[in-house]
Curated annotation (Swiss-Prot):
Cofactors (names): pyridoxal 5'-phosphate
Cited InterPro entries: GrpII_AminoAcid_Decarb (IPR050477), MfnA (IPR020931), PyrdxlP-dep_de-COase (IPR002129), PyrdxlP-dep_Trfase (IPR015424), PyrdxlP-dep_Trfase_major (IPR015421), PyrdxlP-dep_Trfase_small (IPR015422), Pyridoxal-P_BS (IPR021115)
Source species of the chain: Methanothrix thermoacetophila (strain DSM 6194 / JCM 14653 / NBRC 101360 / PT)
Name of the protein described by the UniProt record: Probable L-tyrosine/L-aspartate decarboxylase
Pfam families listed in its UniProt record: Pyridoxal_deC
Gene name of the encoded protein: mfnA
Top-level taxon: Archaea
Family: Belongs to the group II decarboxylase family. MfnA subfamily.
Enzyme Commission identifier(s): 4.1.1.11, 4.1.1.25
Length: 383
């Protein structure tokens, strides 16, 4: 049982308490299951500079508000829209909620449905509950991209939004956004792209594909700086092609320095926007290309070494997400955890899921591969 202390502790004692609890957390150098990573040092410094700021009341913090406008503009241009609108959110879940809410509000319906891929993030299940919308899940094709024909089958006159994924959580796959865009335009339905992970990967890959605002039917995109953008948690981005959907989210804020507010949360730390701006300005396109290239090099190395062990990926990796076909994925996962490695699993098909993030080193990856081989040999022998 925890109670409010009668008398406070010294700062040193509080620090010791925090250090002890922090020591129980998993070190990033053993994490292959997370889509988050250590924030860049320049982002950490920027975050600490803006701890006191509140973007929920931007008139009090005009400099911080300008930073957010710049971040939205920069992310919009990265995603193929030079006059985008939006805001810095807490992450992908909030951005997805707000994107669908904007689409629902634009439709004028309160009894609608949305069509998402079966591979969609669980935030869309939360959306069903929060917004009282039916979530229809379209099947995937053999490459684990959404089946556009099934999406078309699920659309009716109550459909308020279509969703495509650019970097699925389990497999890192990219849906055929161009085809979904055409479907959205034909039916007069907005298309939202969840690029929470892929948003800071796809623009920096050598191979380009149509997944962003270049597809005319795309109304909104979720992109998370606190993933491959290397900004501290929580830092998300909700980017709209135009201002109208954002206005559909506004509510009156009579006691603040602005009369209306579109964000889901009221009080919003400006630190996330500042940190995101700092790391973007520091790394630039060239810096992010190097970060992504290194992650893809590790991805290719992992797949090559896995194949040498007789293990194939479920799909050829599109980005730095790998799903390996192993016998008894739960058993392999447990055995790796006993050796200090944190990996996860996919659902269908069941496989070992690995994310090669910037915090992983070549040396630790080779240690992991050695342990993986030992685990597989042991399990095959029944050990």
């Amino acid at each position: 049982m925890y109670t409010f202390p009668e008398k406070g502790l010294s700062e040193d004692m509080v620090t010791d308490l925090l250090k002890e609890m922090r020591s129980r957390d998993c070190p990033y150098d053993r994490l292959l299951s997370t889509m988050c990573t250590r924030p860049h040092p320049v982002a950490v410094r920027a975050y600490s500079m803006f701890l006191e700021t509140n973007l929920g009341d931007p008139g009090l913090f005009p400099g911080t508000a300008e930073i957010e406008r710049r971040v939205v503009g920069i992310l919009g241009s990265l995603l193929g829209c030079s006059d985008a609108t939006g805001y810095v959110s807490t992450g992908g879940t909030e951005s997805n909620i707000q994107a669908v809410r904007a689409a629902r509000n634009s439709s004028g319906r309160r009894d609608g449905n949305i069509v998402v891929p079966r591979s969609a993030h669980f935030s869309f299940d939360k959306i069903a509950d929060l917004l009282n919308l039916e979530v229809r899940k379209a099947e995937l094709d053999e490459s684990l991209r959404v089946d556009v024909g099934d999406v078309e089958r699920l659309i009716d006159d109550r459909t308020v939004c279509l969703v495509g994924i650019a970097g699925t959580t389990e497999f890192g796959q990219v849906d055929p956004i161009g085809d979904l865009s055409e479907l959205a335009i034909e039916n007069g339905i907005p298309l939202h792209v969840d690029a929470a992970f892929g948003g800071f990967v796809l623009p920096f890959l050598e191979k380009d594909c149509m997944w962003d605002f270049r597809a005319e039917g795309v109304q909104s995109i979720t992109i998370d700086p606190h993933k491959m953008g290397m900004s501290p948690i929580p830092a998300g981005g909700l980017i709209f092609r135009s201002s109208d959907p954002l206005r559909r989210l506004e509510t009156e804020t009579y006691y603040l320095t602005v009369s209306r507010q579109a964000s889901l949360t009221g009080t919003r730390s400006g630190a996330a926007a500042a940190a995101t701006y700092a790391v973007i300005m520091h790394l630039g396109i060239d810096g992010y290309r190097k970060v992504v290239r290194r992650c893809m090099d590790m991805t290719e190395h992992l797949v090559s070494e896995a194949r040498a062990m007789g293990i194939e990926p479920v799909i050829e990796p599109v980005m730095n997400v790998v799903a390996l076909r192993v016998d008894d994925p739960p058993g392999v996962r447990r055995a790796l955890l006993e050796r200090g490695w944190h990996v996860s699993m996919t659902r269908e098909p069941k496989a070992l899921r690995l994310i090669l993030m910037p915090h992983m080193t070549d040396e630790n990856l080779d240690l992991f591969l050695s342990d993986l081989e030992d685990v597989l040999i042991s399990l095959r022998r029944g050990g």
